[in-house]
A protein has these predicted regions:
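Single conserved hydrophobic/aromatic residue that forms the stacking wall/gate
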Residues: 1-9
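Ca2+-coordinating acidic residues in Ca2+-binding motifs
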Residues: 4, 192, 212
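Eukaryotic low-complexity, mixed-charge intrinsically disordered interaction/regulatory segments enriched
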Residues: 6, 15-16
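Iron-sulfur cluster-binding cysteine motifs and their immediate structural context
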Residues: 9-13, 95-113, 120, 124-141, ...
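Generic structural signal for hydrophobic core residues of well-folded globular domains
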Residues: 13-14, 38
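Short microdomains enriched in Cys/His and/or Lys/Arg
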Residues: 16-28, 33, 79-80, 117-128, ...
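Fe-S ferredoxin-like electron-transfer domains
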Residues: 20-98, 102-113, 139-150, 154, ...
Length: 231
């Protein structure tokens, strides 16, 4: 079996259709080596970071039941979707934390927090989350939406104070056309957002009625405040 696995990996690495930059932990150094060994064209490596799209604590999401069982997210998800009234909420048992091979995640008040310095974007947490609410987004992203709820506005407000209500305001005001509503959830084309630059003044954040469209990193907020002072 081990020999077969090695041959499978070798075939994948040598496959011309497979780019040489898929080893996120290895970043550009490993990508360059793979490209050199296989004769493939070097492709840039985008640094990505895990992001948990849930604001259960901010939204004061209540419990729908008291879960008694194995203290894992995978087990809790089988019990009527978990203990929280929002069926898209982070379950809070830390399966993602346990799965992270780089110790880049930790539970704080029952919610996973990501260390952006330690996170290499390997995606182990993404694959582990039974709710599918963890995504990999560019480390330089300016904005994001920490909510995965796909229900109607009425249903969202019944369980969460800050959840996305799919009002499409962000979609309408984004001059870069970087924001879309797909299958009930807001998606951001971060390349379009970053390429457009700060000229939009992050209007998506300002116009969001739920204040769930937020700055992704402190640097983006600091830059916004600096521009406001200079105006």
């Amino acid at each position: 079996i081990r020999r077969q696995r090695q041959m499978c990996i070798r075939d994948r690495v040598n496959d011309p259709s497979v780019p040489p930059n898929l080893c996120f932990p290895g970043k550009e150094e490993v990508a360059a080596l793979v490209a050199e060994i296989t004769g493939k064209k070097m492709a840039s490596v985008e640094n990505v970071t895990a992001a948990v799209r849930c604001s259960r604590l901010d939204g004061n999401v209540k419990k729908q039941l008291d879960y008694i069982g194995y203290s894992t997210c995978s087990a809790a998800a089988l019990a009527y979707g978990g203990p929280w009234a929002c069926k898209f909420a982070c379950l809070g048992f830390g399966d993602c934390v346990s799965a992270c091979p780089f110790d880049a995640m930790v539970l704080v008040d029952g919610m996973p927090q990501v260390d952006p310095v330690a996170c290499v974007g390997c995606g182990s947490c993404v694959r582990t989350c039974p709710k599918g609410i963890i995504e990999l987004i560019p480390s330089q992203a300016r904005v994001w939406v920490p909510c995965s709820n796909r229900d109607s506005a009425k249903a969202v407000k019944a369980v969460c104070e800050v959840g996305c209500i799919s009002c499409r305001m962000c979609v309408k005001v984004c001059p870069a056309k970087a924001v879309t509503l797909e299958e009930g959830i807001i998606r951001i084309d971060h390349k379009k957002c970053l390429d457009y630059g700060t000229g939009c003044d992050e209007v998506c954040v300002e116009k969001c009625p739920q204040k769930i469209f937020r700055y992704y990193q402190p640097a983006a907020l600091a830059d916004k405040e600096k521009r406001a002072e200079a105006a």
